[in-house]
Amino acid sequence: MDNLQIALSYLKKGVSVMPVWSPSMVERRQPAAFMKRLAEAKAKNGASDNPLPEQDVVRKALINQCKAPVLYAWKEYQERLPTVEEVTQWFTDNPDANIGVITGKVSNLVVFDLDSAHASQFAEEQGGFPLTIMAKTGKGYHAYMRHPGFVIKNSVNKKLDIDIRADGGYVVAPPSLHGSGYSYQWVEGQSIYELDPAECTHWMMEYLQDIATPTTEKQKPERKEQKATHT
């Protein structure tokens, strides 16, 4: 199947999709925003006391661009599924585009993005993941879970190397090409065609609820100088 057919097959599964920049698209079109960021990155690197090889600077910029939506505005697709006609038009105009899966309530998905072996180890120590849709990424895995129903913002945890993509977010899905050259792939036996997203387990629910709770609503620790309560 080509990317249009694959995107339509995801849509048929009830998933909101959109086109995302691919390496070949960037090379062919050289979008202005990408070229500007690349020029800035090269200038900053050139002024550094420990500059990176130019190819590494270009590679990093390409990786970032290949995670960016082609659409200038995609907020409405966080609220509704695109039509078959819309998806067909997008991927007819951009046949080599990567495929973005919009997460959140619209697709009934929350994705745990594990970016390292450390992140995978943490997840295993918490009880691991149930049998669910899983994709291989360059550094780790995307675990596709059923959305729990409450609002979940996207989050980045640099300490654990676990990112959450939920309401207002998206992930790049197989068989898209990463800016570094590898392709996203479904884990054998755990593709979107073979499984439905599993419900979040206890540790995942606690993790998501902690993200969803505003800091001001979390219980603050008692001050040491606080007077004792009389009974």
Model-derived features: positions:
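Conserved phosphate/metal-binding and DNA-contacting active-site motifs used
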Residues: 1-225
